[in-house]
Amino acid sequence: MKKLLYLFLAVSFIFTACKKEQGCTDAIATNYNADAEEDDGSCAFSITGGSWITQSIEQSGNMTVSMMGIPIIDSVINYTETNADSLDPYKLTFEDDNTYTEHDQLNTEVESGTWSISGDVLTVNTPDTTLSLTLNTLNKDNLSMTINIIESGTEDGITFDINIDQKVNANRESKRWDDWMAK
């Protein structure tokens, strides 16, 4: 009986010792577990880790322009731009040190600055202004962020009011595997 008990304990120990460790197995995830052998679906992703290539920019809102109180323009704006030559920003790269660079279609650096995230708000400090964008989607392959642009003013008797939501939809252009393994 004692031998049977030892045999049962030994077999139980072998089966529990052979259990695969679960965790995030994606190397660009913020919670990557190099010891995990089985992906448990828990991967969380950051805005860093490759560049974001803009696929479309959606704009919706309204604009009014009046002259001496008389409406000249009263428009509802609603369109989506997908032509790569017209997308601005085209390519954004966010680094782990909280810096970013923007590149055009020829991969020429257009500007750079700093960034931070608090909750679902991405704050981008450009050379001449600070932008606050709401992160709608952020996963391994997709980034969607929205900024609300509100401007109003009067110049030479012409008054304008603009209220536009601009949504940028981008896909991740991942760094090479070798770059990730070097980390």
For each feature predicted by the language model, list its residue ranges.
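A detector of repeated loop/turn-to-beta-strand junctions in beta-rich toroidal repeat architectures
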Residues: 40, 109-112
